Swiss-Prot record:
EC assignment: 6.1.1.14
Disulfide bonds: none
Any GO BP annotation: glycyl-tRNA aminoacylation
Catalytic function, reaction form: tRNA(Gly) + glycine + ATP = glycyl-tRNA(Gly) + AMP + diphosphate
Subunit structure: Tetramer of two alpha and two beta subunits.
Organism (species): Streptococcus suis (strain 98HAH33)
Protein name listed in UniProt: Glycine--tRNA ligase alpha subunit
This protein's UniProt keywords: Aminoacyl-tRNA synthetase, ATP-binding, Cytoplasm, Ligase, Nucleotide-binding, Protein biosynthesis
Places the protein is found: Cytoplasm
Gene: glyQ
GO cellular component, one term: cytosol
HAMAP family recorded: Gly_tRNA_synth_alpha (MF_00254)
GO MF term set: ATP binding; catalytic activity, acting on a protein; glycine-tRNA ligase activity; transferase activity
Length: 305
């Protein structure tokens, strides 16, 4: 192993590597979400015919995983480094292994395994062929080829690579607790995040107002529907994300029964599907601007026929 990179050096290294592969370096999307996949930079851009290559860090909130800052590996909020490439390069796995080498991890010196783990997100109507990537026995990455997003079949296929930054940093820095990770020289992860972890856990499990959350879910759902009636995809999707996070808070609080849980997930999924269809329709009206001229002309001609 080379010099132990800090957390922010890991991010900078990955950004530089994927920038070299032609990815847009996006910024984290400013609405709560449970995974980088739910960012519009992945969810929306994975559907339709236009090419899209992007990489970004996404803070991901999972209220039920909060442990008051007492568990060394389970967190209310963790960070993912998300890469999406569409169409998927034929050498995407080789590129991924090369990215690990940039981080000082030589694939020839470590046990790196791709373990089949097909992916599904019921609340957004999304699924794909997938693998977990295990490094010396620890999962550090999820690899997915999207087959369906928002209930729509994908084409061309999008490849998604999701690095778990805390796990990766724990491995590189050889620490047992995420709170001991060096975020930057002289500053530990715990000095930044242990207090928010405690407070968000306490809020999620003990303090949140269930009646308010239930009311908000319905309001967010109706507002998403209103936005969709006006063809406003991005505001509508923001409210879908708010529905999802509100549901996760309700779930963490134990305010949703098993039967109700399925109903809430179905309501979010129905909205996500309409968002996906509307997004593709709106991009088509614009003439799919990210396509090259020849492909665009051919595609629009086929649709006209």
């Amino acid at each position: 192993m080379s010099k132990k990179l800090t957390f922010q050096e890991i991010i900078l290294t990955l950004q530089q590597f994927w920038n070299e592969q032609g990815c847009l370096l996006m910024q984290a999307y400013d609405t709560e979400k449970g995974a980088g996949t739910m960012s519009p930079y992945t969810f929306l851009r994975a559907i339709g015919p236009e090419p899209w290559n992007a990489a970004y860090v996404e803070p991901s909130r999972r209220p039920a995983d909060g442990r008051y800052g007492e568990n060394p590996n389970r967190l209310y909020q963790h960070h993912q480094f998300q890469v999406v490439m569409k169409p998927s390069p034929s050498n995407i796995q080789e590129l991924y292994l090369e990215s690990l080498e940039r981080l000082g991890i030589n694939p020839l010196e470590h046990d790196i395994r791709f373990v089949e783990d097909n992916w599904e997100n019921p609340s957004t109507g999304s699924a794909g062929l997938g693998w977990e990537v295990w490094l010396d026995g620890m999962e550090i990455t999820q690899f997915t080829y999207f087959q369906q997003v928002g209930g729509l079949a994908t084409g061309p296929v999008t490849a998604e690579v999701t690095y778990g930054l805390e796990r990766l940093a724990s491995y590189i820095q050889e620490v047992d607790s995420v709170y001991d990770i060096e975020w930057a020289d002289g500053v530990k992860y715990g000095e930044i995040f242990i207090q928010p972890e405690y407070e968000h856990s306490k809020y999620s499990f003990e303090v949140s107002d269930q009646d308010m959350l239930l009311e908000n879910f319905t309001k967010f759902e109706k507002e998403a529907e209103r936005a969709l009636e006006e063809g406003l995809v991005h505001p509508a999707f923001d409210y879908v994300l708010k529905c999802s996070h509100t549901f996760n808070l309700l779930d963490a609080r134990g305010a949703v029964s098993v039967t109700e849980r399925a109903g809430y997930i179905a309501r979010i999924r129905n909205l996500a599907r309409v968002v996906a269809k509307t997004f593709v329709a709106e991009r088509k009206k614009l003439g799919f601007p990210l396509l090259d001229e020849a492909t665009r002309a051919e595609l629009l001609k086929e649709d006209a026929e």
